[in-house]
Amino acid sequence: MNAIELKNVNFSYDGKTRILENVNIALDYGEVNLISGHSGEGKSTLLYIISGIIPNITDGNLSGEVLINGEDIKGKRLGEVCRKVGVVLQNADEQIIQKTVEDEIAFGCENLAFSPEKISKQIDTVCRLMKLDQSWQSRKLSGGQKQRLITASTLAMGQKIVILDEPLANLDTAGAEMLMSTLKSLAKAGYCIIVIEHRLDVVLPFVDKVFHVGNKSVSEITDRENYLKEQSTEMEDTCSEFSGALPVFSLSNVAFSVKERGILNGVTFDVLKGSRTVLLGENGCGKTTLLRLISRLEKPTRGVILQNIDDKFGQKSKQSKKWYQKIGVVYQNPDYQLFMPTVEKEIKFGARSGEYADEIAEKFGVKQLYARHPQSLSEGQKRRVSIAAVVATAPEVLILDEPTVGQDYRGLCKMVEVLNRIHTDTKNTMITVTHDCRCAAALCDRAVWIENGTVRHAGGKEHISAFFRLDAQCKG
C-alpha cells in the first residue's frame, strides 16, 4: 500500500482555470520525495491537497482521488488528516506561536493528547536532531533557527508522512545538508518524506524520487543530471568599479547584545560607496543584526558606525527623514513589508514615479500580478514584489536580507541579473545577506565573513568560495 496516491486529480481555485490537471502519482514509505518546478506552477497547491488544507481551509474545485494509506481523504475533516500527515510550511513566522522552543514543540503534542512523559521525550529527541536549545526565546531566533524549530515541532507530533515546503530556504549549506541527512534517516526508519525545494544541488543527493510540477501536470524525473542542467542557467556577473571610493558605512569595534546575550563583538569593516558587499556566516551569527544596525533599526551596545549618506561623514545626519529615504531595506520575511491591497499599489506606494515603478515591476516579472492581493501570492512571488517595491524607491543604498529565498533557479538567475543591471545603471551600494551558494559570488565585489559575532575575514570574493567549502565540511 502506498503512503500517498493521487488518481486523476484536478484542481482549480476559481472553478475555471485549472492549476493541476490529471495528476497521477504514488509516494511510498521509506523514501524521500522531491517536488520541484518553477515558482507559481502549483507545488504548494499540491501540498495543500495532500495535507487536506484543500478543500478544508482553502476553497476550490477538487476532483479525483487523494488516498492516504489507501483511504480517500477528500471527505475527511482536517483534524483527521493532520494525525496522518505533518506539514512544515514556507513561512516560519506564521507557524510559531509560543514564547520558547520548548513550549512551541510541546504545543502540537499537547493537542494530540500525548502524555507529559512522552512530550518531554519528544522535545528532547527533536531538539537534538535540530540542534535547538529548549530554553531559547522564539522571537530571538534567526531565520534559520526558526526554520529548524517549526521542523522540530512537526516531527515531534510523530506523523509518518511529513511534507516540508522549502525547508532549506533560511538554512546555510551546512544546516541544509544536516536537515536533509536527518530526513533521509527518518525515511530509512519508515517515514514518507516529501520535500518541496528549489535548491536542487543540495537536495538531489538525498532524495529517492524526483517529481516535476509544470504545465498543470506532475511527472516523475528519472534523468536527474539532465534535469539539473535544464533547471540551471548561467548567472550574469558584473564587477563594480569603486577603486578609491569612500566608505558609505564604516563600522569600528561594534558590539550588540540583548540583555546578557552577546550577538556581535568587535565588528570592524567598511562598506565602500558603489560596491556590492555580501555578508556571510552561519545561521544565528549576527548577519541580520548587522543589517539592522547599519540601517539604524537598532543601536550598537558599543562601538561606532560612521555614515557617508548625506555627503558629510559622521555618526548622525541632521536630516534624518532624508537619510532614511536614501536607504532601502528588504527584510527576510516579505509579509512584514506587504500591506497594500494590490501588487500595483504596493510597488507604487513609495516609488520615485509611477513610470519607474512599472519599469521595475516589468524587470522583476511581477507586472502581470498588478491586480492580485500581495498576500494571495506564492512565497517566491511575494519576495519579488517586496524587492521590486523597495527598488522602485530608487535608494542609494539597497540592503537585502536573504533575497533569493523561495526562488527557483530560473527566477534566482533573473533576480541576480536585474539587481546587477540596476546596480550598474544607478551606481547604488548593495549590501546582501545570503547563504545561497548559487548566487553569492554573482552579487559580490567584497565579502565579509561573520563568525561567532565578529569578522573572520573581509576582502574580495575569494572569501565566498572559502566560506562555502568550510560550510559544507561542517555539516552535521
Annotate each predicted stretch with a short phrase.
Residues S51, S295:
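Helix-to-loop junction immediately C-terminal to a conserved catalytic motif
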Residues T151-A152, I387:
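Hydrophobic anchor residue at the start of the ABC signature
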